[in-house]
């Protein structure tokens, strides 16, 4: 939500629907109900610039929860200078499904805090980079953008938008396996 307006609502709905389908959870979610719930949450609260988490559960019948969560976006200085990251050997069970995994979240949060890091870069068992624990990873190589293959990451809205902007501006995007020992070369 930016300035009280939901952004990329249809895309977020589509990504959530795909996660529900890929996870094998029963039931489904209706776009109009999704949209109306988001709009009602915004209308009934005074928050203008926060993220919304939508959690979907199914136990005999579907339950969808919509609630604001704290968000943090890098400052101009952090964008210019970069942020401290840490690598962590950890894989999500199905990277294409956005789901809550308490053990994963607790471990990543602890590692980020212990290392005073902004983000954790997830490293697979074969020493390849997948994505950030809560962000997309893109590397610049000359005039190209390098990112992990679709099979290794959450195919989220932000990633899709970044790739679209690159394509619209004739910036090459290469989706390929990125080895841990390559990171420093970017």
Residue positions per predicted region:
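Phosphate/pyrophosphate-binding loops at sites that engage ATP/ADP/AMP, CoA/4′-phosphopantetheine
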Residues: 41-46
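Ordered, amphipathic secondary-structure segments that act as subunit-interaction surfaces
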Residues: 47-54
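Helix-start/capping segments and mature chain N-termini
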Residues: 1-40, 59-186
């Amino acid at each position: 939500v930016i300035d009280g307006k939901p952004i990329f609502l249809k895309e977020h709905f589509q990504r959530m629907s795909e996660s529900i389908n890929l996870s094998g959870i029963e039931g489904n979610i209706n776009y109009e109900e999704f949209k109306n719930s988001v709009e009602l949450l915004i209308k009934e609260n005074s928050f203008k610039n926060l993220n919304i988490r939508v959690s979907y559960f199914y136990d005999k019948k579907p339950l969808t929860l919509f609630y604001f969560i704290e968000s943090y976006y890098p400052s101009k200085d952090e964008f210019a200078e970069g942020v401290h990251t840490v690598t962590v050997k950890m894989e999500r069970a199905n990277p294409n499904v956005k789901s809550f995994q308490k053990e994963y979240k607790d471990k990543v949060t602890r590692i980020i805090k212990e290392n005073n890091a902004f983000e954790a870069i997830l490293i697979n068992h074969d020493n390849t980079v997948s994505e950030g624990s809560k962000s997309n990873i893109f590397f610049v190589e000359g005039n190209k953008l390098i990112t992990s293959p679709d099979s290794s990451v959450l195919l989220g809205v932000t990633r899709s938008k970044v790739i679209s902007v690159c394509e619209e501006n004739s910036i090459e995007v290469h989706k390929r396996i990125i080895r841990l020992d390559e990171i420093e070369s970017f």
